[in-house]
UniProtKB/Swiss-Prot annotation:
GO terms for biological process: translation. It comes from the Bacteria. This is Small ribosomal subunit protein uS8. Pfam families: Ribosomal_S8. One of its GO terms (cellular component) is ribonucleoprotein complex. The lineage of its organism: Bacteria, Pseudomonadati, Pseudomonadota, Betaproteobacteria, Burkholderiales. Keywords: Ribonucleoprotein, Ribosomal protein, RNA-binding, rRNA-binding. NCBIfam families: PRK00136.1 (NF001109). PANTHER family: 40S RIBOSOMAL PROTEIN S15A. GO terms for molecular function: rRNA binding; structural constituent of ribosome.
Length: 131
């Protein structure tokens, strides 16, 4: 059976791994998942990520980050889902926790944070919130 929402699965795997204080989490890879991992790394929410080939299938390994024994990512929430897509124009892009968190937006220029989308003046699909 195929997975209906691989991005929600990725976010859930990260949340579950952090709940049991794993050092890293492994999942099937895709271009969108790698782009999300790159944004998370650029924003300092994860240590590193790597894509490896195993038996013709690529896997994404994400190194999780902790501070004072607690996960750096406190909130990881899927916004736009396959059954209900959420699009925001350039003037409607949401702020997460008044700017303390990040919204990951899929724009025509690629995946970026809410701050960068506002600065660039583009809107798009709100993938998830991270705080």
């Amino acid at each position: 059976m195929s997975m209906s929402d691989p991005i929600a699965d990725m976010l859930t795997r990260i949340r579950n791994a952090q709940a049991v204080e794993k050092a890293s989490v492994v999942m099937p890879s895709s271009k969108l998942k790698v782009a999300i991992a790159k944004v998370l790394k650029d924003e300092g929410y994860i240590d590193e990520f790597a894509v490896t080939e195993q038996g013709g299938k690529s896997t994404l390994t994400i190194g999780l980050k902790y501070y004072a024994g607690r996960p750096v990512i406190e909130r990881l929430e899927r916004v736009s889902k396959p059954g209900l897509r959420v699009y925001k124009g350039r003037n409607e892009i949401p702020q997460v926790m008044n700017g303390l968190g990040v919204a990951i937006i899929s724009t025509p220029q690629g995946l970026m944070t809410d701050r960068r989308a506002r600065a660039t003046g583009v809107g798009g699909e709100v993938i998830c919130y991270v705080a």
